[in-house]
From Swiss-Prot:
Family recorded in the similarity comment: Belongs to the glycosyltransferase 29 family.
Listed name of the protein: CMP-N-acetylneuraminate-beta-1,4-galactoside alpha-2,3-sialyltransferase
Lineage of producing organism: Eukaryota, Metazoa, Chordata, Craniata, Vertebrata
UniProt source species: Rattus norvegicus (Rat)
PANTHER family (alphabetical): CMP-N-ACETYLNEURAMINATE-BETA-1,4-GALACTOSIDE ALPHA-2,3-SIALYLTRANSFERASE, SIALYLTRANSFERASE
Enzyme class: transferase
Domain of life: Eukaryota
Subcellular location: Golgi apparatus, Golgi stack membrane; Secreted
Job description of the protein: Catalyzes the formation of the NeuAc-alpha-2,3-Gal-beta-1,4-GlcNAc-, NeuAc-alpha-2,3-Gal-beta-1,3-GlcNAc- and NeuAc-alpha-2,3-Gal-beta-1,3-GalNAc- sequences found in terminal carbohydrate groups of glycoproteins and glycolipids. The highest activity is toward Gal-beta-1,3-GlcNAc and the lowest toward Gal-beta-1,3-GalNAc.
Main subcellular location: Golgi
GO molecular function, one term: sialyltransferase activity
Matching Gene3D superfamilies: Glycosyl transferase family 29 (3.90.1480.20)
Amino acid sequence: MGLLVFVRNLLLALCLFLVLGFLYYSAWKLHLLQWEDSNSLILSLDSAGQTLGTEYDRLGFLLKLDSKLPAELATKYANFSEGACKPGYASAMMTAIFPRFSKPAPMFLDDSFRKWARIREFVPPFGIKGQDNLIKAILSVTKEYRLTPALDSLHCRRCIIVGNGGVLANKSLGSRIDDYDIVIRLNSAPVKGFEKDVGSKTTLRITYPEGAMQRPEQYERDSLFVLAGFKWQDFKWLKYIVYKERVSASDGFWKSVATRVPKEPPEIRILNPYFIQEAAFTLIGLPFNNGLMGRGNIPTLGSVAVTMALDGCDEVAVAGFGYDMNTPNAPLHYYETVRMAAIKESWTHNIQREKEFLRKLVKARVITDLSSGI
């Protein structure tokens, strides 16, 4: 009799466990599906701030884009002289063509990073799941989570993201690039020797371990070093760098990485993974793949930087963006001889989708393309 009671109780406990497990799994799948639905369904015309009778694409962008300012924005910015920074311009223009646009997240992770549900529930590159201890250890040493005080105090910020594209060569855009308040550079793209075309100023350099400059003398003074974490090893690498520990070449990197970054901890930041997630699934519409890194669903660092700038800058420009796949022998980057055809070998990026996204922004004057490569 005692055995029967034990078996009955065991079965009841097992059933309860299965029911709770099913409910938890269902809730998780529903949470994930909000991303998949937004990328696979035509949005209703009266949802998310959209205007009735206006046509939008499957992501929520206006179908008919032009370079004319909406009437209310034309009035708002009518008295600004040419070249003057227009407060709120980029976000206002973005909202006009993409009503779902919002600015809920800080540029960089801070000591409250655990409260952000959007990144807490995804593994890198789309979130921080499993990285709490590493991030906490890094932030306990860096202790700085914002731009510099001088930049934070600006009433209006003009930002430019300098891409690495060969389209920058011989454009002589250096002085125009240096006129911006914030100059964002990507990975190991050099400045020295290319100042005439790419400028000499660097405010932020965003990179990941394999993309970081390996020679300490290449790093610019007075710039912030920003990690974009695409895998858990990237956060581990940054901890090594911050604590000045030895970096092992066998720590899961796909090429050699920098073993030293000549920056003090307060000059180091961690890019909020929200912007990788937002660029991939909300703005570009890349495959969701259950929130995991997969074929063709990782945005390039350039598109991620644009997404970040739309959130943190009043005006946004780009230079050195654009891959012309019809000219396979053109230089891929302004600083080396690798040809355009090499980009086709990438399995993580969807260049065509990104081009469509960036063209929308340029056509609607959300961003300015100085080198006309998009």
